[in-house]
Amino acid sequence: MAGEENNRGAFHIQAFYCREMDAPIYARLCEAIATGLTRSSRTGAAMLDWAGEPTRDALPLRFIGGLHALVLAGADDDLADVFSGVIDQPAAIETVLARVLTDHDDALLPWLDGPPQTNEPGRSAALMLGLLAVAERLGPKLEIIEIGSSGGLNLLIDRYRFDFGGAGVGPKDAPVTITPEWRGEPPAIPPIDIISTRGCDVRPLTVTDP
């Protein structure tokens, strides 16, 4: 059993990564959860008594996914203010969370049953760098087959423009340009031709479905 201290610590760890990724709203939210969580709700008790390894199990993401679902559904105005950054003081965030856990306990608890699927186009930058290395060694024509493609955003990689420290790859008129933080010399950009992209997932998501 992980123990309460370790389970709270998972939210501190998530807060650290949120700060590193310039996501201060989520960082404040995670810190408030870690500090203010109690057993006064079934959801709170389930998190504090989590029997698995909370970081590996993505416990913070499971709970925050549930909170975000409430915001998207328009179910709680104060929580929406936390997510938008209008409410940004730790004590105020803890107060909102305590009430939300009481008012929406039944809606939040099922979100702990499984980790959320996260879709972030920026992850395609690392994939493209790998594809460039393959193209340089084996030639430009590549096929992508992704296992666990979720909403399929990586499968749109041939439609994104990438800027790697000033070295560009992808359509110049692409509607999305991904510019990761780059240190050092820009990479070589060999010819690359992605001729097909395919993916599979046990629970595929439709990203156009709000």
Locations of regions flagged by a protein language model:
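Short, well-ordered alpha-helical packing segments
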Residues: 128-132
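Class I S-adenosyl-L-methionine-dependent methyltransferase module
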Residues: 49, 53, 73-102, 118, ...
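A short N-terminal interaction module
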Residues: 1-106, 110, 114-117, 121, ...
